[in-house]
């Protein structure tokens, strides 16, 4: 009987130490340290607007063509969302191992179970050169903005 009490006491201490809790330990739930800030995020730093020069630069780096106003609007929404995430005050917040705070997760050992299957993997490639995957053949840099068809960014 005392072994069970020690085991539950030790489990409660380990759960408290890691910042995890379970429904079986109501005493630990009162002491649990959460790993996310309780205060609301600060106001965003920018409005998400992107200049035509930045869009051209991103198109050349990412080999993506933002050919419509809808694509530019989607990019601006993504940047505004990233600005909101950047504005969150994370000072004093411990790094998390998992988003599941209520259970202890154990990592599996990293063992190789199969190997030397390069030939099998390369069979899935569209194009192979000397045992290497080749990037998609359409992956060429975009022409500069003055060489492209006119497009108005309305900024």
Curated annotation (Swiss-Prot):
PANTHER family: GLUTAMYL-TRNA(GLN) AMIDOTRANSFERASE SUBUNIT C, MITOCHONDRIAL. Keywords: ATP-binding, Ligase, Mitochondrion, Nucleotide-binding, Protein biosynthesis, Transit peptide. Belongs to the GatC family. It comes from the Eukaryota. InterPro entries: Asp/Glu-ADT_sf_sub_c (IPR036113), GatC (IPR003837). Its EC number is 6.3.5.-. It catalyses: L-glutamyl-tRNA(Gln) + L-glutamine + ATP + H2O = L-glutaminyl-tRNA(Gln) + L-glutamate + ADP + phosphate + H(+). GO terms for molecular function: ATP binding; glutaminyl-tRNA synthase (glutamine-hydrolyzing) activity. The lineage of its organism: Eukaryota, Metazoa, Chordata, Craniata, Vertebrata. Residues 27-48 are annotated as: Disordered. Residues 1-20 form a transit peptide. It is an enzyme of class 6 (ligase). The keyword Aminoacyl-tRNA synthetase does not apply. The keyword Ligase applies. One of its GO terms (biological process) is regulation of translational fidelity. Subunit of the heterotrimeric GatCAB amidotransferase (AdT) complex, composed of A (QRSL1), B (GATB) and C (GATC) subunits. Allows the formation of correctly charged Gln-tRNA(Gln) through the transamidation of misacylated Glu-tRNA(Gln) in the mitochondria. The reaction takes place in the presence of glutamine and ATP through an activated gamma-phospho-Glu-tRNA(Gln). It is found in: Mitochondrion. Pfam families: GatC. This is Glutamyl-tRNA(Gln) amidotransferase subunit C, mitochondrial. The gene is GATC. GO terms for cellular component: glutamyl-tRNA(Gln) amidotransferase complex; mitochondrion.
């Amino acid at each position: 009987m005392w072994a069970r009490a020690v085991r539950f006491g030790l489990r409660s201490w380990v759960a408290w130490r890691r910042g995890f809790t379970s429904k079986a330990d109501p005493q630990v739930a009162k002491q649990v340290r959460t790993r996310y800030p309780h205060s609301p995020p600060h106001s965003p730093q920018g409005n998400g607007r992107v200049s035509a020069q930045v869009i051209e630069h991103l198109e050349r780096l990412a080999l993506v063509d933002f050919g419509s106003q809808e694509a530019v609007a989607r990019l601006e929404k993504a940047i505004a969302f990233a600005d909101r995430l950047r504005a969150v005050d994370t000072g004093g917040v411990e790094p998390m191992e998992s988003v599941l705070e209520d259970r202890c997760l154990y990592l599996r050992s990293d063992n190789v179970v199969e190997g030397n299957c390069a030939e099998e993997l390369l069979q899935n490639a569209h194009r192979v050169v000397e045992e290497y995957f080749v990037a998609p053949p359409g992956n060429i840099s975009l022409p500069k903005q003055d060489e492209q068809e006119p497009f108005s960014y309305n900024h």
